[in-house]
């Protein structure tokens, strides 16, 4: 009779263990984000180019993603980087004001001498240096989190 009691206890422990394992599996399934592309992109860094990069961005960024601004083309079809819109100059001016308020002061003499021309040249230089998601993931390798940086907010 003693062996039957031990057998029932072992069977009960196995049943409890299976029940706990099933509950943990169900809890993990609820916690794991199913709407993100994180499961579809294996961990680690990847080199993604062309359609593979586009597909990965579509999966990772369901609300779209940022791209680099294209050069504006004039009515004749020629691109002209020197023609910046007034709104872009104002946007850059507000950026400089923010930096100025953060403790970075700029020379009023240079501002008076060059005006928005300095801002335009800085923006053009910044555009040239940053290659965006293509440079990040095709020229170099990138991870899921690096792709997610380019996602638009909801």
UniProtKB/Swiss-Prot annotation:
GO terms for cellular component: extracellular region; extracellular space. It is found in: Secreted. Heterodimer of a B chain and an A chain linked by two disulfide bonds. Residues 72-92 are annotated as: Disordered. Its main location: secreted. Keywords: Cleavage on pair of basic residues, Disulfide bond, Secreted, Signal. GO terms for molecular function: hormone activity; insulin receptor binding. Pfam families: Insulin (PF00049). It comes from Drosophila melanogaster. Disulfide bonds join 49-138, 61-151, 137-142. Belongs to the insulin family. It comes from the Eukaryota. Possible ligand of InR/insulin-like receptor. The keyword Disulfide bond applies. This is Insulin-like peptide 1. Residues 73-122 form a propeptide. Transmembrane segments: none annotated. InterPro entries: Insulin-like, Insulin-like_sf, Insulin_CS, Insulin_family. SUPFAM superfamilies: Insulin-like. Residues 1-29 form the signal peptide. One of its GO terms (biological process) is insulin receptor signaling pathway. Residues 79-91 have a biased composition (Acidic residues). The keyword Transferase does not apply.
